[in-house]
């Protein structure tokens, strides 16, 4: 669905749904059946007709009220992001999260409180295990514009050359920064072999270090001259399989903006699936061959992991 050339008359839909906070059991709307789904519609934002609901898992993370990183909803209570985003402070009270945000800066959405931050115990300053999760004080209720992203099964990685998308606000061309306010964007990238990635970054190797890009990382190259840049940290790298979006990576770092010779580096989510499950702790497996047959009540409060040919409800 493209909105750019559509006449804005008659497209003034209601404002984006804010997260509804509640302590009662969740009852999802009839449109919700799994993770990794989109509900695209057109809306006038700052005088322009834009697509909304295209990346409903995307969240903005704020430190003392200022945007610092992106993240993604993986659970009613939990947000996935990069560990280096949370180095400013270990105090969860300093962080808040906004969901359902289309443009930055955003003054219309409520800031959701964070009760705990979990940084991977082996995290080393972008070089390894750059992954973290935030726990929200109150559960987020799904809506057409606020939904979770799927996570891959353990150690599953997309094939080399697969086209995926990086989602976030810190995406730009090699020259020229985006003007604010600007909308959440998605740019196409292709998966690059880690060995090629290591060769490109060999000048960064320390003495006696054999490789720079480990198995816990993924690499991509820009498809159309656009790539991750500043403020993109923590954003999701998503790939579509069987009409379902799966988060394969978390933006970690890159060398410059949009330089094809220097791939962008991501934390591989499949490498940390078990770690995420251990941290959240309330997970239960349930195989489902046909996700739409599941009751909305069953979906309540869990993460969805995806394997090829089936979905896994945790």
From Swiss-Prot:
<dbReference type="InterPro" id="IPR018114">
    <property type="entry name" value="TRYPSIN_HIS"/>
</dbReference>
<dbReference type="InterPro" id="IPR001254">
    <property type="entry name" value="Trypsin_dom"/>
</dbReference>
<comment type="similarity">
    <text>Belongs to the peptidase S1 family.</text>
</comment>
<feature type="disulfide bond">
    <location>
        <begin position="69"/>
        <end position="85"/>
    </location>
</feature>
<feature type="disulfide bond">
    <location>
        <begin position="164"/>
        <end position="239"/>
    </location>
</feature>
<protein>
    <recommendedName>
        <fullName>Serine protease 46</fullName>
        <ecNumber>3.4.21.-</ecNumber>
    </recommendedName>
</protein>
<dbReference type="InterPro" id="IPR051487">
    <property type="entry name" value="Ser/Thr_Proteases_Immune/Dev"/>
</dbReference>
<dbReference type="InterPro" id="IPR009003">
    <property type="entry name" value="Peptidase_S1_PA"/>
</dbReference>
<keyword id="KW-1015">Disulfide bond</keyword>
<dbReference type="GO" id="GO:0004252">
    <property type="term" value="F:serine-type endopeptidase activity"/>
</dbReference>
<dbReference type="GO" id="GO:0005615">
    <property type="term" value="C:extracellular space"/>
</dbReference>
<dbReference type="InterPro" id="IPR001314">
    <property type="entry name" value="Peptidase_S1A"/>
</dbReference>
<feature type="transmembrane region" description="Helical">
    <location>
        <begin position="293"/>
        <end position="313"/>
    </location>
</feature>
<feature type="active site" description="Charge relay system">
    <location>
        <position position="84"/>
    </location>
</feature>
<keyword id="KW-0645">Protease</keyword>
<feature type="active site" description="Charge relay system">
    <location>
        <position position="233"/>
    </location>
</feature>
<dbReference type="Pfam" id="PF00089">
    <property type="entry name" value="Trypsin"/>
</dbReference>
<dbReference type="GO" id="GO:0016020">
    <property type="term" value="C:membrane"/>
</dbReference>
<keyword id="KW-0812">Transmembrane</keyword>
<feature type="disulfide bond">
    <location>
        <begin position="197"/>
        <end position="219"/>
    </location>
</feature>
<keyword id="KW-0378">Hydrolase</keyword>
<feature type="disulfide bond">
    <location>
        <begin position="229"/>
        <end position="257"/>
    </location>
</feature>
<keyword id="KW-1133">Transmembrane helix</keyword>
<dbReference type="InterPro" id="IPR043504">
    <property type="entry name" value="Peptidase_S1_PA_chymotrypsin"/>
</dbReference>
<feature type="domain" description="Peptidase S1">
    <location>
        <begin position="44"/>
        <end position="281"/>
    </location>
</feature>
<keyword id="KW-0472">Membrane</keyword>
<dbReference type="GO" id="GO:0006508">
    <property type="term" value="P:proteolysis"/>
</dbReference>
<keyword id="KW-0720">Serine protease</keyword>
<feature type="active site" description="Charge relay system">
    <location>
        <position position="130"/>
    </location>
</feature>
